[in-house]
């Protein structure tokens, strides 16, 4: 059975050896964080490297390929400066849906406001509406049905942020 903590610990040690002091952050996102992972789930890891280059991306791929269950690897890698300049609309959701393993994510992102969270919800609702209308017209019923789990996931993310706005409490799981 796949053990996420062991995977993350191994990955962390390998990345520290490769990037040295340039490794700023490693975090867990997705179904393993929410306790919803199945046998088929991938593991969503967020990595931040100072002054990231294309070579660093190649090194990251090389490291992942050395790990057991490398085919489960998924996630996001970025540079420290790029993250500091990230769109504030996404920061509340990012911070609340990522568990720190190495470094502290909240210290690496721009500040966000209630306005940003509301704008994120509004943008997400608009994108969801667009997707649903598009699929209704241009996709078969069978394909629409197969896409429902992804739609549910989008709705859940929207509801997380609405609940946060109304209560100040960010619910991490369904």
Give names to the regions the model predicted.
Residues 75-80, 106-110, 139:
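Short acidic, glycine/Ser/Thr-rich loop/turn "cap" segments at secondary-structure junctions
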Residues 85-107:
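Ordered, amphipathic secondary-structure segments that act as subunit-interaction surfaces
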Residues 73-76, 89-96, 122-123, 141:
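A general structural signal for short secondary-structure boundary/capping elements
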Residues 23-32:
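Short gly/ser-rich loop at a beta-strand->alpha-helix junction or flexible surface loop bordering the NTP-binding
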Residues 1-18, 34-40, 46-88:
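Metal-dependent nucleotidyltransferase catalytic core
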Residues 111-174:
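Conserved nucleotidyltransferase catalytic core and NTase-mimicking acidic/glycine-rich helix/loop elements
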Residues 49-55, 102-112:
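Short, polar/flexible loop-turn hinges at active-site or ligand-entry regions and domain interfaces
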């Amino acid at each position: 059975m796949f053990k996420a903590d062991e995977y993350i610990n191994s990955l962390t040690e390998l990345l520290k050896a490769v990037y040295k002091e340039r490794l700023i952050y490693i975090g867990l996102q997705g179904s393993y964080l929410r306790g919803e992972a199945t046998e088929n789930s991938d593991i969503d890891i967020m990595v931040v490297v100072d002054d990231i280059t294309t070579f660093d991306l190649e090194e990251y791929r090389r490291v992942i390929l050395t790990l057991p269950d490398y085919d489960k690897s998924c996630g996001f890698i970025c540079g420290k400066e790029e993250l500091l300049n990230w769109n504030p609309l996404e920061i509340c959701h990012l911070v609340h849906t990522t568990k720190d393993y190495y470094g502290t994510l909240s210290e690496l992102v721009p500040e966000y406001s209630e306005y940003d969270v509301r704008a994120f919800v509004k943008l997400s609702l608009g994108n969801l509406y667009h997707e649903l209308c598009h699929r209704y017209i241009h996709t078969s019923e069978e394909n629409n049905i197969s896409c429902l789990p992804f739609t549910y996931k989008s709705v859940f993310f929207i509801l997380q942020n609405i609940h946060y706005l109304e209560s100040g409490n960010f619910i991490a799981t369904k």
